[in-house]
């Protein structure tokens, strides 16, 4: 496979992940399944939903969730720095989410929905440690940010042999937790396979077999092979919230479906709950298989920073470290 094809797949993974996140955000964190079903029963196009159903916060349509925003911060850092530097990444993360930013707003579950973007509590706690220079500043919780935010890192370092180390460094800034790290590393290895090799129905099996044995492999394998369930039912079975392993299992259940980009994102949107990180993951996996042409141009234009992320992704793909 030519390097030009790999570069296009790397670019597609970045854009596909972030556009999917933006397309999903208006219906992020909706846990009332009956309300969700009623809203989408007669809608063939759930993306960029005009009615903001998210009960926790209100924000502009086309913007990124907190998961996509972390993805974007990493993308921007990699391009501007021409590679990963932990100290500079921590500084960029703090500047983007820390004091004086739109994310540094009072938020209380007693006064919902909040007006403006949401910052998860474990990020707030991590920011306090980042300021002190602690390189493992993250909170000890297993959350889906771990895999949802690292697509740009995979795109740059696919095939380089450095991916595991860099993934761990990035994740521990926010989530100093072994399950979070291992989940992100497995997500990265599967995405790396798609970027380097394109579509491969055996990708999951190959990556799983080559992944070090640990207590998490069975959970991932179980979700992937649970093929009798619809994705909606799989998400309900494994957990529609933000925690791991459930959130990642819901994303992994998609892998065997072999759907195109649009169908994949729509399926993920309709699964409800904490669907933005699943959209980040699924959007990256499927776009890396089909290439940049699979992402609808009108979806990119409906993404607030759509043109910017395309430009950043193009620049990053030319800096791939393989």
Curated annotation (Swiss-Prot):
Expressed in the rhopalia. Present in both the large and small eyes. The keyword Flavoprotein does not apply. Pfam families: ADP_ribosyl_GH. Disulfide bonds: none annotated. One of its GO terms (molecular function) is structural constituent of eye lens. Signal peptide: none annotated. This is Crystallin J1C. It comes from Tripedalia cystophora.
